[in-house]
Regions:
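Enzyme catalytic cores with a strong preference for nitrogen-chemistry domains
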Residues: 1-162
């Protein structure tokens, strides 16, 4: 932290469609590069683990399982990383498929942020595969506290969700 600010970075790793293992390695390479620059908040694109253009492959258990396994691998490989990391993947939950950003911190999955607006026009027909998160689908959990003022000992809890 410098002057009360943290370093934030958005990464765009090389992505191979439906090759979660290769994409995970590219994500880890980017994370390690950002670590060298002392980045504390790392954000990756939606579906960076699977690739955005998987279309009907998103409905295949094999791809969903591979994406989940790779998320666990990325979490394990970043247990020593002092940063909050967001990576995108498809996630099945309660019978629905969501486009989510998974939040990772020190090797733990601390939450998921589901996409709320699912486009369905022109080349975007995500509603064919994905559900949008409704308020009743989202559970808010306290996962981060930020100090308001160094002189006060007042802390605000930041809700996690959409």
């Amino acid at each position: 932290m410098k002057h009360g600010f943290i370093k934030v970075a958005a990464a765009t790793p090389r992505v191979t469609v439906a090759d979660c293992k290769a994409n995970g390695e590219e994500i880890l390479k980017a994370i390690h590069e950002m670590e060298k620059e002392h980045v504390k908040l790392m954000v990756f694109p939606e579906f960076c683990i699977t690739g955005y253009t998987c279309h009907d492959l998103f409905l295949q258990r094999c791809l969903l399982d591979s994406a989940w396994d790779e998320l666990l691998h990325i979490a394990e490989e970043t247990r020593e990383t002092d940063a909050l990391i967001f990576v995108g993947l498809p996630l099945r939950h309660r019978g629905k498929l969501y486009n989510v950003a998974a939040a990772l911190n020190h090797g733990r999955i601390v939450g998921f942020v589901p996409k709320t607006y699912i486009p369905n026009y022109n080349e975007f027909y995500e509603q064919r595969q994905f559900a949008g998160a409704e308020e009743e689908d989202v559970e808010f959990v306290d996962f981060l506290k930020c100090e308001k003022n160094e002189e006060d000992e007042i802390w605000d809890e930041i809700p996690f969700g959409t």
